[in-house]
Amino acid sequence: MPTFRTLDEADLAGKRVLVRVDLNVPMDEGRVTDDTRIQAILPTIRAITEKGGKAILLSHFGRPKGRDASQSLAPVAAAVGERLGAPVAFAGDCIGSDAEAAVSTLAPGAVLVLENTRFHAGEEKNAADFVQQLAALGDIYVNDAFSAAHRAHASTEGLAHKLPAFAGRSMQKELEALAKALEAPQRPVLAVVGGAKVSSKLELLGNLTAKVDILVIGGGMANTFLAAKGVKVGKSLCEHDLADTARQIIATAASHGCEIVLPVDAVVTKTFAAHADHRVVPVDQVAEDEMILDAGPATVALVREKLKGAKTVVWNGPFGAFELPPFDAATVAVAKAVAEATKAGALLSVAGGGDTVAALNHAGAAGDFSYVSTAGGAFLEWLEGKQLPGVEALRR
């Protein structure tokens, strides 16, 4: 039984349901260019309207300093209506007379988008008076924005203390997937952590060494670990000043019985460009004028071998400069191996973080992972073992 209330438990008929969603979508000249986040909230909207509830959507958009017409949610509301295949009304404010008038005219089953919550300073301050004004517009609160759950703002956290609070379908799916991956996982758990810098993932690495059985480190951050072990990495991206930190992480992992897997070979080049001349070498044979841009085939084979025994995989960050072919090979090969094992029922696989989602989509593997989180910052904070205010506020 989940530790939070879901829409299945809510009496929604005729109720004004304030739904915190994430409509902070990419736009170009008034058109939505990626509707992933809109698609994610449709099941929640439908669950509310089918039960006769009035769905009133709250979201931020961008980082406006006060009211800014260029950051209005009006064009996004139109896009929600198109994807929903139903009329979606829009109110020019999220509090005050405009919002009150729009809410008062809603019939059961109707959908309304309120204007950008960040047009008001009270949103990010989680100001009591702003929370109260929002709460006055609803009878029930639903949070369906895991991607904003790491922020203790009025619409993500404050409202949950003022109205009966429930998790939306997308939030529920995310929390259930994450619980299976790290809170009560099937072991062994293998984590893949890649990306450019160790400095941006220190807390994450520290938390994972205590929770997983095998930690595979790739990307630019692997160079820092290799250098800390005395390997010369040439001109590769490397945080030499973090050598002590890397050694500390290796020691912590050993004390927890967590095996760290580093690249054993590398794809090196002298030029940071797609299709640059390159060669594959063991990691201890990188020339002074070369840089590592990907893990090599022996590393891929090693990771595939480790995957055979794993029951759960958590992935954050690519293995190499995946946006520059052919330096995408390791990321693509390992992603496909995880996807195949998941499809065969051998693995539960959870991945997240902006670059990670892009890398898995590039590999054509995202669809076969058990769960791919589009949450970015909230997913990272969860991996770091932090409590997320928006989630904590939903707990029973």
From Swiss-Prot:
This protein's pathway: Carbohydrate degradation; glycolysis; pyruvate from D-glyceraldehyde 3-phosphate: step 2/5
Binding residues annotated for ATP, in chain numbering: 201, 323, 353-356
EC code(s) of this entry: 2.7.2.3
Short name of any one Pfam family annotated for the protein: PGK
Bilayer-crossing regions: none
GO BP terms in the entry: gluconeogenesis; glycolytic process
Reaction catalysed by this enzyme: (2R)-3-phosphoglycerate + ATP = (2R)-3-phospho-glyceroyl phosphate + ADP
Class in the EC hierarchy, top level: transferase
Single GO MF descriptor: ATP binding
InterPro entries: Phosphoglycerate_kinase, Phosphoglycerate_kinase_CS, Phosphoglycerate_kinase_N, Phosphoglycerate_kinase_sf
Gene Ontology terms: cellular component: cytosol
Compartments reported by the entry: Cytoplasm
Residues reported to bind substrate: 22-24, 37, 60-63, 118, 151
Xref: SUPFAM superfamilies: Phosphoglycerate kinase
PROSITE patterns per UniProt: PGLYCERATE_KINASE (PS00111)
Alphabetic keyword roster: ATP-binding, Cytoplasm, Glycolysis, Kinase, Nucleotide-binding, Transferase
Quaternary structure note: Monomer.
PANTHER family from the UniProt entry: PHOSPHOGLYCERATE KINASE (PTHR11406), PHOSPHOGLYCERATE KINASE 1, CHLOROPLASTIC-RELATED (PTHR11406:SF23)
Similarity section: Belongs to the phosphoglycerate kinase family.
The name this protein goes by in its record: Phosphoglycerate kinase
Source organism of the structure: Azorhizobium caulinodans (strain ATCC 43989 / DSM 5975 / JCM 20966 / LMG 6465 / NBRC 14845 / NCIMB 13405 / ORS 571)
Primary gene name: pgk
